[in-house]
């Protein structure tokens, strides 16, 4: 492969992630940073940015994908952005994506709206559900299931989401719902929004979220075409008590969530999940000679489906296998395929060591200057988790799955872009995404 071709691939993939990252993040990330404005030290006001460019990259499911992405941020409102893309591929897959975030309501300045719209027709989709004739006596997606027990075929995956976020008038948001951060070479140089004391009234940002969602996924299997449709509402209470939510170095995050599909309109079935998540960040001692920043990041997440019931040997009132209690993919258990494990309940643990070295050669590379890379970060991580047919601490902590890996992360255009590689007993997973996993 020529050097010019490699440059185009890296440039295109990075651009695609920066364009679609905020929307793609909703597929699995449960805590997004509060509304904010990030500037460099000495910068007087935010500078609107617009981008438009072709992109290309290669994956197992899309083969060669190509398209055009465009959008901008800071034009209508300093903290808001809107981006979109069209995509085609060499295996006849195609898609349209449109995302927007941090749009402040005109008559209620503490309410922000995000949206995420997508239509996609894909030549290859994989779902870990029952129906594989080679595994008639097993439950697909279970903790003890075979890695080959899945269904694969062409089909559509379409979704629409609207997230409403109310920022409470206390803590770091007592005067304004939008925090401003100033960075020096990508490291926080202004006053942190939290992290030193755990007190929602004086530190950090507390947010109440309501997310309305709709998703339809089909799978063409010969003459059969199973269709799974879901729609509903998710309510979350989040306390983000970190110093800099985009790249935390100290503090903590807590989240409680309740999701309900009421069975309205064309929903396949009703279901309810409840979940809790907590993250903690520690700045490790450093001499400043080798590292700009060294952080230990810890995360725990658990979820249950109280509506779940078994009727005539079939599991009813459960979320689709790609939502709810699932492990595997971009965010949790990165050594396994997307949605590899799914059941009634799940638990997950992760530890990451994130290091930003003093040495930073990337700004000297001319074809990377467009991305305004402030730093690169090296990450080592380990994960453990399990799904189960009941929420029981004993069962959830027995025969747990595990993986470990390394990552390379960049701060490009004031956003964190990551490439993670993880190893598990079932193989190696490689994931590119915007934002830390937690």
Predicted regions and their residues:
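Cleavable N-terminal export/targeting peptides
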Residues: 1-38
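Outer-membrane beta-barrel initiation region
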Residues: 26-128, 149-154, 161-165, 174-177, ...
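Transmembrane beta-strands of outer-membrane beta-barrel proteins
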Residues: 50-52, 80-85, 110-116, 206-210, ...
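Short glycine-rich beta-strand segments
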Residues: 120-122, 210-217, 257-264, 301-307, ...
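Flexible, surface-exposed loop regions and adjacent strand-edge segments
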Residues: 130-137, 181-182, 223-229, 271-275, ...
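Outer-membrane beta-barrel "beta-signal"
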Residues: 164, 168, 406-412, 427-438
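C-terminal outer-membrane beta-barrel translocator/porin domains of Gram-negative envelope proteins
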Residues: 233-238, 242-371
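Outer-membrane beta-barrel transmembrane domain signature
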Residues: 352-364, 369-404
């Amino acid at each position: 492969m020529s050097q010019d071709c490699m440059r185009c691939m890296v440039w295109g993939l990075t651009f695609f992630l920066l364009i679609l990252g905020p929307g793609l993040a909703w597929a699995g990330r449960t805590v997004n940073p509060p509304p904010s404005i990030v500037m460099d030290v000495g910068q007087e006001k935010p500078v609107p940015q617009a981008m438009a460019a072709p992109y290309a990259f290669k994956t197992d499911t899309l083969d060669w994908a190509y398209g055009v992405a465009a959008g901008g941020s800071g034009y209508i409102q300093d903290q808001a952005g809107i981006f979109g893309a069209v995509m085609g591929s060499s295996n006849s897959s195609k898609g349209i994506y449109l995302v927007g975030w941090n749009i402040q309501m005109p008559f209620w300045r503490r309410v922000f709206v995000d949206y995420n719209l997508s239509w996609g027709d894909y030549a290859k989709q994989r779902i870990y559900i029952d129906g594989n004739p080679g595994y008639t006596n097993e439950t697909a997606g279970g903790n003890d299931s075979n890695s080959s027990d899945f269904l694969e075929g062409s089909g559509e995956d379409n979704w629409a989401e609207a997230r409403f976020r109310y920022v409470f008038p206390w803590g770091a948001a007592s005067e304004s719902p939008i925090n401003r951060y100033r960075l020096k070479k990508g490291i926080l140089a202004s006053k942190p929004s939290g992290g030193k004391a755990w007190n929602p009234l004086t530190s950090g940002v507390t947010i109440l979220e309501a997310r309305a969602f709709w998703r339809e996924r089909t799978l063409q299997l010969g003459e059969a075409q199973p269709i799974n449709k879901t729609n509903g509402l998710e309510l979350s209470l989040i306390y983000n008590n970190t110093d800099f939510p985009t790249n935390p170095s100290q503090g903590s995050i807590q989240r409680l969530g309740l999701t309900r599909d009421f069975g309205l309109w064309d929903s396949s079935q009703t279901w309810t999940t409840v979940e809790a998540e907590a993250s903690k960040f520690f700045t490790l001692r450093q001499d400043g000679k080798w590292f700009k920043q060294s952080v230990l990041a810890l995360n725990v997440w658990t979820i249950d489906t109280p509506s779940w019931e078994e009727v005539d040997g079939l599991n009813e009132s459960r979320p689709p296998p790609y939502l709810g209690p699932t492990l595997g993919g971009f965010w949790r258990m990165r050594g396994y395929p997307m949605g590899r494990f799914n059941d009634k309940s799940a638990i997950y643990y992760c530890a990451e060591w994130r290091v930003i070295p003093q040495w930073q050669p990337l700004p000297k590379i001319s074809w990377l200057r467009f991305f305004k890379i402030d730093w690169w970060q090296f990450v080592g991580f380990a994960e453990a988790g399990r799904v189960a047919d009941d929420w029981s601490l004993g069962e959830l902590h027995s025969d747990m799955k595990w993986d470990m890996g390394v990552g390379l992360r960049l701060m490009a255009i004031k956003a964190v872009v990551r490439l993670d590689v993880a190893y598990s007993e079932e193989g190696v997973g490689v994931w590119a995404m915007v934002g830390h996993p937690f």
